[in-house]
């Protein structure tokens, strides 16, 4: 029974991570009406940038600071890509939009290969979330438990942003 519970919790953690990625993709599609194939590549770029920043910034502040700074850096890159690549194809047929975003994937992947190389990079776990919690004798990573707890708050915050704020009204009107 303990293994079953551990598997359920692992599934919930994976679902939480996928929810976060999918909600970003859904928001971007809702605003731009472009299926952005490069969405995952921006997550990859954020992971690499975060990894590099963690090598420079020390300790716990370095980890969380690197995560926030990587998000800002990739966000700025995303804005540049939107202005330079996506805006010119908004009125084009969907096939051109897909080809444009696929081209962005290729560029980001090649840049990542040039900068970080083909070797897998393993970054540190989040400070305070490195251990496991035993549930009915089965180990469940603390990171998974944190993800399960955080996901409903993110879902609520997104719901509130979209339905109760001026920004949300503008996003829904787009």
Range-by-range predicted roles:
Residues 1-32, 37-174:
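Small-residue-rich transmembrane alpha-helical segments that form helix-helix packing/gating elements
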């Amino acid at each position: 029974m303990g293994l079953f519970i551990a598997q359920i919790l692992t599934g919930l953690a994976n679902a939480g991570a996928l929810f976060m990625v999918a909600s970003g993709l859904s928001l971007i599609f809702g605003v731009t009406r472009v299926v952005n194939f490069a969405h995952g590549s921006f997550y990859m770029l954020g992971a690499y940038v975060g990894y590099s920043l963690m090598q420079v910034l020390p300790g716990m502040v370095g980890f969380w600071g690197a995560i926030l700074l990587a998000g800002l850096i990739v966000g700025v890159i995303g804005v540049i890509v939107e202005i330079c690549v996506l805006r010119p194809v908004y009125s084009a047929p969907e096939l051109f939009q897909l080809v444009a975003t696929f081209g962005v994937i290729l560029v980001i992947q090649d840049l990542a290969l040039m900068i970080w190389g083909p070797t897998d990079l393993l970054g540190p776990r989040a400070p305070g979330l490195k251990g496991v919690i035993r549930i009915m004798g089965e180990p469940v990573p603390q990171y998974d438990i944190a993800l399960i707890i955080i996901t409903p708050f993110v879902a609520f915050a997104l719901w509130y942003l979209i339905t109760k704020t001026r920004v949300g009204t503008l996003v829904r009107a787009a």
